[in-house]
Design a protein with these regions (language model features):
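Helix-rich effector regions associated with P-loop NTPase G domains
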Residues: 1-91
């Protein structure tokens, strides 16, 4: 696998909690105050991402989160902000 989907999903969670507080709570009914892996676990539980009975499928939960992000189902989210590109005097 070229991309670690769970790691990428975790980074997306970290970004959303920091830059768009409340969006994960609203969309997935998860607590944003917990660590990233626990948040992904909660998404897996709430979306019934299971493997062999009751084992959580974290890969599937991460793919679901990433697909929702890519397709705009989480909302209008931008990864770049104007202040990231503001020039300082003398440049």
């Amino acid at each position: 696998e070229i991309l670690n989907t769970e790691e990428l999903g975790g980074e997306l969670i970290r970004f959303l909690v920091q830059s768009y507080p409340g969006v994960l709570q609203e969309k997935y009914d998860v607590s944003e105050s917990q660590d990233i892996y626990a948040c992904l676990e909660e998404i897996a539980k709430n979306r019934h991402c299971l493997v062999r009975g009751s084992e959580l499928d974290m890969e599937k939960a991460a793919r679901l989160l990433l697909d929702d992000f890519r397709n705009g189902r989480i909302g209008r989210i931008t990864l770049e902000f104007p202040q990231d590109y503001e020039e300082t005097d003398g440049e």
